[in-house]
From Swiss-Prot:
GO terms for molecular function: protein kinase binding; ubiquitin protein ligase activity; zinc ion binding. Zn(2+) binds at residues 93, 96, 115, 121. The keyword Iron does not apply. GO terms for biological process: innate immune response; regulation of gene expression. The keyword Metal-binding applies. One of its GO terms (cellular component) is cytoplasm. Pfam families: SPRY, zf-B_box, zf-C3HC4_4. It comes from Homo sapiens. This is Tripartite motif-containing protein 49.
Length: 452
């Protein structure tokens, strides 16, 4: 083949980012190709759309598939380079003047066929050099994929922890205000209890804030270690075959150790101190709610903070997501336009539920609407996220960092004050009060759960 044509052919097999032959090449929407590791490293911090470095067109970086044809061609190009290298005079076996084609996996040396049969190497494990190099490169790529998945998980966790740290003081202040407002409705003799509960909340809030900072620092440090290890594996992967085999060493073992002890996000939880006489006061406004049941689509609600996890209702003994979920809505027959009302819902040990009140027009809308924090839905919900449950309220959408209720939850609706309060009945404590609700009466009770 003409040398000029050969150079053009080889040039098509070179990644424009690292300027080496492709390893695990991916072709993006615009048609340009890159090594997967190079693509990852260059666009790690851009979550969705990225610009191609070659043509500046935007592309999505999800579900990238290996370009098998390009990978095979790049592998052939490496074999040609290896053959040219091994055919040079200085690489010939000094004893037998034969081309070294064999790799000894025991002492990581290159041997000619005669040397591999010698007394010294006879019982060692041998492989053709090009086979051994490709096998080692594939092992590196597999380990890199594991590293990258952990790095992405750590990156997501770091974002969660960063957001929690940034918002934590405001969240604690909101809870303090809600509890103060609740005590203002109680008799004056509760002053000492109020003081104690507020002081405990402030103390716990400061402790958690400090722990969040430490957790965030650990994750940031782990991110640097994971990225550094990934870059080292990537560099090793791009080495010429002979260099790769002889420098391989303990790199896989070291990469395994990096994957151990991955820091996990905190599950911060503020104690909700009991308010003496809370339920007695609320029971003055007790009403009995009659429910109208209907089956709904399984994605009626979506909780964006917990990454698209459906709200539902399943028991702890049932494996999660083992069957097709069925959603059920229960609308209150009654509607409210003014006054104060209180009712309770038994949630037990279940999770994946939501209940509260909604503006009447919400009932008439498409049942596949999602919780997006917009006006009209005033709910408390509980979702199962991996191994833990999280509480949230809507309008606006907000995580509630308090213990999950395990029996009954009360709802207090004050139409004139434009507030919806949720209480843990067993603990006689305030979960949260949604202030400044954008009511558009009539208001209707709503309950949703999903069975799996």
């Amino acid at each position: 083949m003409n040398s000029g044509i050969l150079q053009v052919f080889q040039g098509e097999l070179i990644c424009p980012l690292c300027m080496n032959y492709f390893i695990d090449p991916v072709t993006i929407d615009c048609g340009h190709s890159f090594c997967r590791p190079c693509f990852y490293l260059n666009w790690q911090d851009i979550p969705f759309l990225v610009q191609c470095s070659e043509c500046t067109k935007s592309t999505e970086q999800i579900n990238l598939k290996t370009n098998i044809h390009l990978k095979k061609m790049a592998s052939l190009a490496r074999k040609v380079s290896l053959w040219l290298f091994l055919s040079s005079e200085e690489q010939m076996c000094g004893t037998h003047r034969e081309t070294k084609k064999i790799f000894c996996e025991v002492d990581r040396s290159l041997l000619c066929l005669l040397c591999s049969s010698s007394q010294e190497h006879r019982y060692h494990r041998h492989r053709p050099i090009e086979w051994a190099a490709e096998e080692h490169r594939e092992k590196l790529l597999q380990k890199m994929q594991s590293l990258w998945e952990k790095a992405c998980e750590n990156h997501r966790n770091l974002n969660v922890e960063t957001t929690r740290t940034r918002c934590w003081k405001d969240y604690v202040n909101l809870r303090l205000e809600a509890i103060r407002a609740e005590y203002q409705k109680m008799p004056a003799f509760h002053h000492e209890e109020e003081k104690h509960n507020l002081e405990m909340l402030k103390k716990k809030g400061k402790e958690i804030f400090h722990r969040l900072h430490l957790s965030k620092a650990k994750m940031a440090h782990r991110m640097e270690i994971l990225r550094g290890m990934y870059e080292e594996l990537n560099e090793m992967c791009h080495k010429p075959d002979v260099e790769l085999l002889q420098a391989f060493g303990d790199i896989l073992h070291r990469s395994e150790s990096v994957l151990l002890h991955m820091p996990q996000p905190l599950n911060p939880e503020l104690s909700a101190g009991p308010i003496t006489g809370l339920r007695d006061r609320l029971n003055q406004f007790r009403v009995h709610i009659t429910l109208h049941h209907e089956e709904a689509n399984n994605d009626i609600f979506l909780y964006e903070i917990l990454r698209s996890m459906c709200i539902g209702c399943d028991h702890q003994d049932v494996p999660y997501f083992t069957a097709t979920p069925r959603s059920f809505l229960a609308w209150g027959v009654q509607t409210f336009t003014s006054g104060k009302y209180y009712w309770e819902v038994h949630v037990g040990d279940s999770w994946n539920w939501a209940f509260g009140v909604c503006n009447m027009y919400r009932k008439e809308k498409n049942q596949n609407e999602k919780i997006d924090g917009k006006a009209g839905l005033f709910l408390l919900g509980c979702v199962k996220n991996d191994i833990q449950c999280s509480l949230f309220t809507t309008s606006p959408l907000m995580l509630q960092y308090i213990p999950k209720p395990t029996s009954r939850v009360g709802l207090f609706l004050d139409c004139e004050a434009k507030t919806v309060s949720f209480v843990d009945v067993n603990q006689s404590s305030l979960i949260y009060t949604i202030p400044n609700c954008s009511f558009s009466p009539p208001l209707r009770p709503i309950f949703c759960c999903i069975h799996f």
